[in-house]
Amino acid sequence: MSEGKEKWGVAHIYASFNNTIITVTDLTGAETITKSSGGMVVKQDRNESSPYAAMQMAGNVAQAAREKGIVGLHVKVRAPGRGKQRSPGPGAQAAIRALARAGMRIGLIEDVTPVPHDSIRPKGGRRGRRV
């Protein structure tokens, strides 16, 4: 690595209410450097989306990225979107905080949830889900 030239990457955080997935790529997004998901750090399925799992994943991902020479990350947060919920799950905020705490420099934080301009018909039928 040359002096004065810092290597940056992009952390793609997909946070739903069932799981959290963190993928670190180069700036173009073409090459995956490291990735981690909730099932890789916790045993129970119900804990995959928890903030604790997100913190563990972020620590693992930050360590692997630092070994490859990356000093900072731009963060792209994504929720399921489209016909599902448009707010990120509980692991998103914890993952960003843990990345910063692990010594990675944080650049841009961007929400890239796919939002439809003319929504598809929601599931549940004409009268909706009756509870």
Curated annotation (Swiss-Prot):
Keywords: Ribonucleoprotein, Ribosomal protein, RNA-binding, rRNA-binding
Function (record text): Located on the platform of the 30S subunit.
Name of the protein in its database record: Small ribosomal subunit protein uS11
Complex formation: Part of the 30S ribosomal subunit.
Signal sequence segment: none
One annotated GO biological process: translation
Cellular compartments per GO CC: ribonucleoprotein complex; ribosome
Gene3D superfamilies: Ribosomal protein S11
GO MF term set: rRNA binding; structural constituent of ribosome
Family: Belongs to the universal ribosomal protein uS11 family.
